[in-house]
């Protein structure tokens, strides 16, 4: 049987070697205190966690510890979270899905640009939103949205939950989470069934997969590339194409494995320089290792294995980046179009 406390201890033991900040590590590593905090932070609000582009590992850990539904974009680095909800855009856009209308608070990690339902959620006037901003650049300016900006995990937990002594009506956190998990599993099963029918068509199949409105082929392709990256321990770079939305719909969630790192130029350069970005990610495995006896620089390390997933237009827009001279370091790059 699944033991959330045992899982929490195991994850906390691995936190020290992760990319979490010292404050985030302290919040997770002190497992006993974290579990004791949960007795105080009994949810009195129907809170969800949005992990957008660049959100980071802590978004998944935060949602897991507090048993909150997690809406994680493919490039959030939180898609693998135990509470990551597949097909969250579809659930949010479904006017008949009651839990979507019942959301009271949102904790936001990262930069949301991928999903219109997420944008609509963050613009709702009946919802309080908090943005996690532990490290701010010197040029940082808050946006126009009326978000509460918080910099510590403890503040986030206080925002997402409330003291049981002060709450008039408590929310059963497992019940709130399950209200999202079960419908999401049904949509996931439906999606996987459509993919299986596409990949292994029967004689009676009459579905027109050439219809641009039918994204089954794209979802099948994106899911396979994602799973290959997981199995081969490759990093991923995602182009700003329909395929990234196909991946958002078809990529595994609810605790299933994800690639070690997933990058995207969301909200930065569109399709400009996507292949160059993937090359740069791969070349980041090299590092200067001093000089030789002739005072020439020595390079250490090796190219990181990277898979780029993009559409045909994104590929054509930056194909010249593949014109690499043999006098330069070469990437370990696989391009899936």
Predicted regions and their residues:
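Redox- and metal-dependent alpha/beta enzyme cores, enriched for Fe-S-associated oxidoreductases
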Residues: 51-83, 176-177, 181-182, 223, ...
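A short alpha/beta connector and helix-capping loop motif
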Residues: 319-337
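Conserved acidic residues
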Residues: 47, 104-105, 234, 334
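Conformationally flexible catalytic loops at phosphate/diphosphate-handling active centers
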Residues: 1-42
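Glycine-rich, anion-gripping cofactor-binding loops and their flanking helix/strand elements
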Residues: 35-38, 48-145, 253-292, 296-302, ...
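Terminal amphipathic helices with adjacent charged low-complexity linkers/tails
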Residues: 2-18, 129-174
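Active-site diphosphate/adenylate-binding microenvironment
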Residues: 181-303
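Active-site beta->alpha N-cap acidic-glycine motif
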Residues: 305, 311-313
């Amino acid at each position: 049987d699944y033991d959330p406390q045992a899982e929490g201890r195991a994850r906390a033991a691995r936190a020290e070697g992760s990319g979490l900040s010292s404050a985030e590590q302290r919040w997770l590593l002190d497992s006993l205190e974290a579990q004791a905090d949960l007795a105080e932070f009994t949810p009195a609000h129907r809170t969800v966690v949005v992990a957008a582009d660049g959100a980071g590992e802590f978004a998944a850990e935060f949602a897991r510890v507090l048993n909150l539904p997690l809406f994680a974009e493919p490039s959030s680095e939180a898609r693998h979270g135990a509470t990551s909800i597949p097909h969250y855009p579809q659930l949010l856009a479904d006017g008949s899905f009651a839990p979507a209308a019942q959301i009271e608070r949102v904790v936001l990690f990262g930069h949301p640009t991928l999903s219109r339902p997420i944008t609509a959620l963050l613009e709702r006037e009946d919802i309080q939103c908090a943005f996690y901003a532990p490290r701010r650049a010197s040029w940082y300016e808050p946006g126009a949205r009326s978000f509460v900006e918080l910099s510590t995990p403890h503040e986030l937990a206080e925002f997402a939950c409330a003291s049981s002594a002060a709450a008039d009506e408590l929310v059963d956190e497992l019940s709130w989470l399950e209200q999202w998990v079960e419908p999401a599993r049904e949509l996931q099963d439906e999606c996987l069934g459509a993919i299986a029918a596409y990949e292994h068509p029967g004689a009676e199949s009459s579905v027109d997969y050439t219809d641009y409105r039918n994204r089954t082929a794209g979802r099948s392709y994106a899911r396979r590339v994602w799973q290959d990256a997981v199995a081969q321990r490759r990093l991923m770079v995602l182009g700003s194409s329909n395929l990234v939305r196909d991946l958002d719909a078809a990529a595994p969630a609810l605790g299933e494995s994800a690639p070690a790192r997933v990058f995207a130029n969301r909200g930065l350069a569109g399709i400009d320089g996507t292949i160059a970005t993937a090359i740069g990610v791969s070349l980041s495995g090299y590092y200067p290792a001093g000089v030789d006896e002739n005072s020439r620089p020595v390079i250490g390390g090796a190219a990181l294995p990277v898979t780029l997933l993009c559409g045909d237009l994104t590929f054509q827009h930056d194909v010249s980046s593949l014109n690499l001279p043999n006098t330069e370091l070469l990437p370990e790059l696989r391009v899936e179009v």
